[in-house]
């Protein structure tokens, strides 16, 4: 069997250049998979940069990762007063509207308002 190198050269499987690139590729992909955070792109920020971000108070949660991915896909953020409504919240509101109707959505809004005002 033959392999094609990155420079376009065709070589046999037992060529040492094929073995070194295959070993390098598999070790770097395993290292990148285990060291990067969930949702981080390959070649993205390493563990040191993520730890530095965590020390600066950057809160990482599944919802923030999902929001970032949805914004990258084109879902808009919109503003309600001085609050930013994230895409996950918009999708949740649409889901609640479909499942519970307008009355259910108003009930959920009332519960949110009461809980938000009771924290003050």
UniProtKB/Swiss-Prot annotation:
A Pfam family recorded for this sequence: DUF4605
PTM-bearing positions, type Phosphoserine: 61
Bilayer-spanning residue ranges: 91-111
Principal subcellular localisation of the protein: membrane
Alphabetical keyword list: Membrane, Phosphoprotein, Transmembrane, Transmembrane helix
Chain positions covered by the region annotation Disordered: 12-59
Gene Ontology terms: cellular component: membrane
Localization (cell): Membrane
Bias (Low complexity): 19-39, 47-59
Membrane topology listed for this record: Single-pass membrane protein
Family: Belongs to the FAM241 family.
Role according to the record: May play a role in lysosome homeostasis.
Protein name per the record: Protein FAM241B
